[in-house]
Amino acid sequence: RATAGAAAVAVRGPGLLVTLADPEPAADDDPVGGGGDVDPRGLVSDSDLQRVVNALWASGAEAVSINGHRLGPTTAIRTAGEAVLVEFRPVTNPYEIRAIGDAGAMSEAFLANPDVRALGTISRTYGLRFDYSRQEDLELPAAPLAELRLARSVADAEGDAAGASRAPASPADRDEPGAAP
């Protein structure tokens, strides 16, 4: 369970599928330009995704992904310019958030969450598309492993330091003026 929560392994099981999407543009009469305006308050933002993800974790999710990108304990969801990023990878509309866990219990707690109810209001008022469903079988990938550039294992560091001078263990081990030889 710890490796699943840390996103270190792929997981499979029942859960919830939540979809957030920008509103459909209003129809207009312009045959050349096509499409109408969309109220920007209905566009999916990084904070909307954060709210859904946090509500899923609070509802008992054991593993979560956004558009196939697995979320771990330190995953950042943020905006850079017009793009929504999960870690440093852009994700695009529509946003599929998958959460593995007890679908029945999660569904009830998820819908009772105040942030989820607020998204329902935004959906009705500004057209943000918001849908969720219980799923019998979801599969989430493992998160990519972090690349260590400078860190080494303790065993490697000790092997490299054999024969090299060690740091003094106590002030008495230091060569300081007035210290006993």
Region spans (language model):
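Core subunits and conserved enzymes of cellular information-processing
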Residues: 1-181
